[in-house]
Structures are given as C-alpha cells and as structure tokens.
C-alpha cells in the first residue's frame, strides 16, 4: 500500500461536454461548447479524518487543497514530471531550465502570456515570491526544497535560484513539486504558511465555484494558458469513510478513484467489465526497515540477507496485498519496471518470489549460527529474534507483518508482530523505537519523484537520520556506511549521466548486500477509472502520466480527459 501518511485518496469523474484532443506530450486544447456539466469527486479514506474547511493555501499542509490533493487544479509547478518515465519532463509555467555554477544555480525561462484566474499577468515576480516565501519560512517548505541562498528575477520571464550546495539531485522537488502562487494576493497574508486562503487565485486549469462542508466544486478556468479544459466541472464530495466511497464507486457515481479496495474485481470491475478498469503501476518499493542502531543480530548484514532469503514475497503480494502489489524482483531496491534503465544488470531478477530455507541455512551457518534447542538460529547463546511493528489500522501492512513473522519461524528465526496505533507507529519509526517495520518507499517528492536517487537517500543518508529517541527525517534504521555516504555526495555534485549511474550502481549494490532495508514489493499507485463517460485516461498502454489522482499529477491528467462520445 502506498500510504500517503495521513491520507489515501479516491477521485471520481462523472460527465463533461466539450471536444479536446488528448495528447501525451502536452495539455489538451480548447473545449467545445455545451451545457452538460462534468463532475469529479475526490474522496478521503476514513482514516484521514479530513474536515472540509475552506482553505486552499498550498503552503499549508493541513489545508483542504493539500489534504485532498487539489492543489494542482488551482496552482501549477514550473514543470510536470512523469514518475513512470524518468527523464520525461513537460513544460508548465516554465519552458526551459539550465544549471550553472556547479549545480548551485538554476535558471528557468518562464512561459509568456500566462494570466492568473483573476486576469492579472503571471511574471517572474510571482515565481520569485513563491521561492522567497519558502526560503524565509521553513514552515512553508512543504516540498522539502534544499537551502536557497538567493532568488532573482532579472526580467519578467526569467527566474534565477541560487542554492547553498549543488542540487542536481533535487530537480523534481524544485521544478515539479513547488506550486507557484500570485504575489499580489499572497503577499498580504500575515503568515503565509498557515493563513487560510478562502478565495484562491492561480494559473491552474480550474477555479473554485462553490464550497460547502458536503461538496466542493471547481469549474474550468477560461483564462488558463492551455485552453479551457474539456472536462468543465470538478466536484469533490464528502464521504464519511472509505466504505462509503467504495459503495459510490461500485454504484457508478464515481469515475476515478485512488483507493485500495479488497475484492476490487467483485465490487467494481465485474459490475461493468467494458467500462470499469484499474491499473496499479508500482510507485514505490515497499521494504522491511531494519533498525541497526540497537545492535544485536539485526546489525549484521548476513542476518539481514538471511531474513530476506526467508521471506515469501509472493505470499505477501497475494495474501497481504490482495495481489495488487507485485513481489520485488531485484535486491537493488529500484522500482521496476519504471526504473529499469537505472538497474545494474547483475542485480536483475536476483530475488526469489518464495522463501529459500536452504539459502537461509547456508548464510547463517557460514556466519557462525546454529539451531538452538528451540529450533531457532542462535550464536553465542543469543537467538535471532525481532518484532515487526506496523499499525493494525493499516490492514495490509499488518497482514504483511503477520505473514513475515510466520515465514521467519518456518526458517528458524524467532519473529513476532507488534500491532500499534498509527500515530504511535509514525513516532516509533521516526524516533527509532522499533526493531523492524513494513514501510513504503520514499524520498524527496515521495512517489511522484521519478528518479531513484531519492529512495537511496531516504534509506541510507546519515545526514538525515538522528540518534535513538530523536526524530529522524528519514534513514529510520540509523544505517551508516561511509561508502554509501560518499556515493550520495558524489551523485549530488554531478550532472553527468554516466557519473550519476556509477554512483547509483554503488548504492544499488550496497542495498543488495548490506540490506539496510529489505525490498518486499512494488507499492501500488492506486487508480480505478471508468470509461463509460470519460476517456483519455493514463493507462498501461498510454502511460503519459502516473495515473493516481494525487498532486502534482491530477491537474495534468484532468486536462487530458474528454467526454466519451
């Protein structure tokens, strides 16, 4: 499951009128005329507890727009990245960019002729204001931007960003996950990170039409630079929980969803096999985090290799994840097939989908372990034993934890399950108060970042971890390896593709042999959609964008949709 920290999302579409070409390389063209409304609903899972509060501030992570992934309807980044196609970058408010000064300076040429939804022109002053806001207010840095030393707007169509260190590796966070806001409306806010924005103004393809605690409605922006979208209305209704949203989806009231739904075929696709579809591409690598700071057997790479060999990934996929998340095939940790181009070929298909008890025995015997009187592997009187901690509310991860514990016992490793409340789990993982945990992949920009470097940084960068008891930004296992750190630093300081791949190979092989985390499955980007009334979806045969209804992609996808004929 790709748990998005506090939320999972379902979005839905109902009908729209207008004619627009669907293009995989850019936005849709002009809409046609007509009066039939198009409706889209984004539904929050019950675990989120999202309250409909009229706040569309993109800097505020607790705003309605942020929590339901509606920012990209109203605001736009400089460029749009396709997580499924690394290197494919679509111009949005920016048209081109260039690095200089050893990766410390990024110059962006901005699109001309763009207007905000209130008719005011968009210029470099707005882009500069956005980045200066993040520079001066850490609480506004929702996209995790690196330290900015200065921002300049030498003319109306040029933005210059200067950073403290080389930032080649953070291109997505800078260009693809920072939403540009209008200076003329945001500059008057007392605290831009928390001030409510009830009447949003942006350059995005939609504008706010109405807001109630039961439904929020957007309509297409007639001033949008890409041409008025063919899908001319977007509705976001309130549902009390995931079950209510699933019922609405099955009843045909929603056309687009992003929820994990058990028995999906029975509840959804079988209702209308011609029109009801789903596609769950792998958007992250789910791993078993290993806490090495507490010492003991888990600090031994050979023990971690043995644990990996004892895991039945196929069983996790089928029983824990309903068959929606494919077993990991490579010990590199890369998301496959999306990141195939970055894979060290010798690490291809080196993970068995099933457990290999013989390999477990071979690894541990060579490492000085033998079975004790209880049938568990031990050395010097100390058994290999650990708990797998996951929230009981994350039913799939909790099921995975139970399966792993059983699989370990079957190969002579004494593992148990520690089911906790979700808030406690987040704190325990960040503070290092756990032994192992099933956890989704991450990195700068999360699952929308197409580049693998962020994942390795998330798993291995010791500048982002913390001592036990203190909250870590990432590297929750407190892994420390000077070779890995050197590769991370080298990658960050080069824009040469061959040199970057060299460093990625080093990191992939460290992940493979040291296993600071153990790859389990490819976490799904949840995406259910209906073609009964809407066409132009991102599909496996036309993956023009990561299909899940999440920011920053959802606004881009909406502009590629059109009513079915």
Where would I find each of the regions flagged by the language model?
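Detector for C-terminal structural segments
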Residues: 36, 220, 311-345, 358-361, ...
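Surface-exposed binding/hinge segments that line
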Residues: 43, 98, 109, 143-187, ...
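N-terminal lobe/hinge region of extracytoplasmic solute-binding protein
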Residues: 45-101, 132, 201
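Gly/Pro-rich hinge or "lid" segments in bacterial periplasmic/extracellular proteins
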Residues: 84, 176-228, 233, 357, ...
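Alpha-helical secondary-structure segments
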Residues: 123-130, 156-162, 204-205, 232-233, ...
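Extracellular/periplasmic solute-recognition and catalytic clefts
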Residues: 141, 150-152, 209-219, 235-295, ...
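Ligand/substrate-recognition segments at binding pockets and active sites
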Residues: 213, 370-444
């Amino acid at each position: 499951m790709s748990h998005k920290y506090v939320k999972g999302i379902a979005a839905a579409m109902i009908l729209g009128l207008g004619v627009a070409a669907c293009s995989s390389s850019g936005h849709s063209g002009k809409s046609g005329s007509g009066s039939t409304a198009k409706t889209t609903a984004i539904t929050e899972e019950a675990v989120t507890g999202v309250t409909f509060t009229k706040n569309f501030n993109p800097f505020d992570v607790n705003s309605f727009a942020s929590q339901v992934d509606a920012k990209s309807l109203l605001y736009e980044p400089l460029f749009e990245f396709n997580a499924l196609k690394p290197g494919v970058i679509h111009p949005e408010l920016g048209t081109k960019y260039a690095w200089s000064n050893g990766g410390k300076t990024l110059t962006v040429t901005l699109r001309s002729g763009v207007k905000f939804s209130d008719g005011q022109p968009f210029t470099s002053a707005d882009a500069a204001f956005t980045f200066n806001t993040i520079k001066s207010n850490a609480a506004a840095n929702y996209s995790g931007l690196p330290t900015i030393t200065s921002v300049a707007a030498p003319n109306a169509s040029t933005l210059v960003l200067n950073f403290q260190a080389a930032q080649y590796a953070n291109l997505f966070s800078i260009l693809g996950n920072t939403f540009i806001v209008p200076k003329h409306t945001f500059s008057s806010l007392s605290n831009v990170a928390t001030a409510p924005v009830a009447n949003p103004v942006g350059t995005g393809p939609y504008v706010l039409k109405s807001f109630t605690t039961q439904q929020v409605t957007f309509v297409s922006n007639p001033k949008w630079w890409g041409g008025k979208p063919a899908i001319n209305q977007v509705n976001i209704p309130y549902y009390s929980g995931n079950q209510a949203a699933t019922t609405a989806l099955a009843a045909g009231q929603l056309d687009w969803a992003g929820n994990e739904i058990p028995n999906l075929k029975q509840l959804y696709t079988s209702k209308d096999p011609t029109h009801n579809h789903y596609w769950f591409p792998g958007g992250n690598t789910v791993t078993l985090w290993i806490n090495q700071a507490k010492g003991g057997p888990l600090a031994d790479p050979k023990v971690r290799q043995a644990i990996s060999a004892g895991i039945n990934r196929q069983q996790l996929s089928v029983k824990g994840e309903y068959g929606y998340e494919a077993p990991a095939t490579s010990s590199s940790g890369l998301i496959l097939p999306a990141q195939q181009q970055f894979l060290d070929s010798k690490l291809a298909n080196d993970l068995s989908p099933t457990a290999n008890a013989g390999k477990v025995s071979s690894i541990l015997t060579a490492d000085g372990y033998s079975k004790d009187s209880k049938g568990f592997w031990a050395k010097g009187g100390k058994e290999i034993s650990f708990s797998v901690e996951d929230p009981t509310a994350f039913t799939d991860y909790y099921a995975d934890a139970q399966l792993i514990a059983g699989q370990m016992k079957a190969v002579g490793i004494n593992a148990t399950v520690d089911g906790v409340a979700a808030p406690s789990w987040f704190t325990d993982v960040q503070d290092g108060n756990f032994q192992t945990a099933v956890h989704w992949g991450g990195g700068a920009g999360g699952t929308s970042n197409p580049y693998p470097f962020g994942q390795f940084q998330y798993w291995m960068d010791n500048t982002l971890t913390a001592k036990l008891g203190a909250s870590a930004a990432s590297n929750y296992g407190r892994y420390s390896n000077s070779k890995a750190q050197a590769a991370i630093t080298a990658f960050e300081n080069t824009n040469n593709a061959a040199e970057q791949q060299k460093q990625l190979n080093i990191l992939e092989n460290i992940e493979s042999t040291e296993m600071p985390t153990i790859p389990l499955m490819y976490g799904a980007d949840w995406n259910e959609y209906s073609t009964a009334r809407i066409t132009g979806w991102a599909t496996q045969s036309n993956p023009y964008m990561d299909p899940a209804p999440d920011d920053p992609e959802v606004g881009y996808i909406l502009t590629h949709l059109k009513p079915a004929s």
